[in-house]
């Protein structure tokens, strides 16, 4: 049954959904990576599609920017449409000097300055982590594709334009690989409602050096990330 934010019916979505922030990226993924594609959501322009990858039913849908937006969509996908696994595919900014532009980062866990998981977890700290099997499958898929993926913590920020530059020093000290805006929220939603989740990011810019990838570089590494996500789903089916 349709929700206030998703005009689909039970069965329209696959049990696994890839989720970029940008709905137009969702459309691009559907058009370039899936077969037999059909649109399953267009409410508020948050496009969602279902198709097949090597015969396996997979969906892709945008989640918007920030934890509040992605939390709404992931919650409804899980509780109203039977989705079991969510893979966020997005971009992040690097803070460590050994993390380079275009690196693929697999988010094993996610720190955050958001309070949403504390609200969920009765004002206690919740360890926002990805599902282990999904992490392992993504790592194995990356190796098979010849992509040297990094595995570690992300930082999910509430502010894109943060005034606290000193926090980047703390992130670097604690080994945070990349800064983005959604992973911790998605991991919290998945835990609360009994689903599994993973975040895979490509490094689009470096916060320290102010370097940025070109449009062509972003597209190449974005395609690598999507391939890793899709192949990891197939590996998960073999478990």
From Swiss-Prot:
GO terms, molecular function: purine-nucleoside phosphorylase activity
UniProt function note: Catalyzes the reversible phosphorolytic breakdown of the N-glycosidic bond in the beta-(deoxy)ribonucleoside molecules, with the formation of the corresponding free purine bases and pentose-1-phosphate.
Binding site residues for a purine D-ribonucleoside: 5, 180-182, 204-205
InterPro entries: DeoD-type, Nucleoside_phosphorylase_CS, Nucleoside_phosphorylase_d, Nucleoside_phosphorylase_sf
Residue numbers annotated as active site: 205
Entry binding sites for phosphate: 21, 25, 44, 88-91
Assembly and binders: Homohexamer; trimer of homodimers.
Residues carrying the site annotation Important for catalytic activity: 218
A Pfam family per the record: PNP_UDP_1
Keywords: Glycosyltransferase, Transferase
Name of protein: Purine nucleoside phosphorylase DeoD-type
Family per record: Belongs to the PNP/UDP phosphorylase family.
UniProt-listed Enzyme Commission number(s): 2.4.2.1
Gene Ontology CC annotations of this record: cytosol
Catalytic activity field: a purine D-ribonucleoside + phosphate = a purine nucleobase + alpha-D-ribose 1-phosphate; a purine 2'-deoxy-D-ribonucleoside + phosphate = a purine nucleobase + 2-deoxy-alpha-D-ribose 1-phosphate
GO biological process: purine nucleoside catabolic process
